[in-house]
Amino acid sequence: MANRLKEKYTNEVIPALTEQFNYSSVMAVPKVDKIVINMGVGEAVNNAKTLEKAAAELALISGQKPLITKAKKSIAGFRLREGVAIGAKVTLRGERMYEFLDKLVSVSLPRVRDFHGVPTKSFDGRGNYTLGVKEQLIFPEINFDNVDKVRGMDIVIVTTANTDEEGRELLKGLGMPFAK
């Protein structure tokens, strides 16, 4: 079963971007390389159970097992020791990446309260886009009754685009609702 977002990319986005930026080859057209979802769980220093719940929610959202991230160095002000588990992250590529992006754009983002589009200023200068989500409840897989605490996450969409403008047009073509 082919993903509808991947088909849209092949049939609509590639020709549109080729025409707009005058690419000589189809391989020069930017594409989404990977999506990294990161959940920093600061409370995990005192309570390891919160990290387990956050990792389970991340696994539900992404469809694959998250990697537990550890503190690189000790910070006394945060009562943090080097090597203590403080977060979870998932790197999505290929089919799962397109499924997640499709779900994010068509289902999850419209469920955000007072949503007027995602900010256009969140590009990093190399065509990659970073999006912060304040609550995990916008994803349909998360059961509202089982949530112990509202947690946010960072979603980084890494593209092969060379400039922010190319990256913006790529994501706009894939249906990302940018603010006017």
From Swiss-Prot:
The gene is rplE. The keyword Coiled coil does not apply. It comes from the Bacteria. SUPFAM superfamilies: RL5-like. Belongs to the universal ribosomal protein uL5 family. This is Large ribosomal subunit protein uL5. Part of the 50S ribosomal subunit; part of the 5S rRNA/L5/L18/L25 subcomplex. Contacts the 5S rRNA and the P site tRNA. Forms a bridge to the 30S subunit in the 70S ribosome. GO terms for molecular function: rRNA binding; structural constituent of ribosome; tRNA binding.
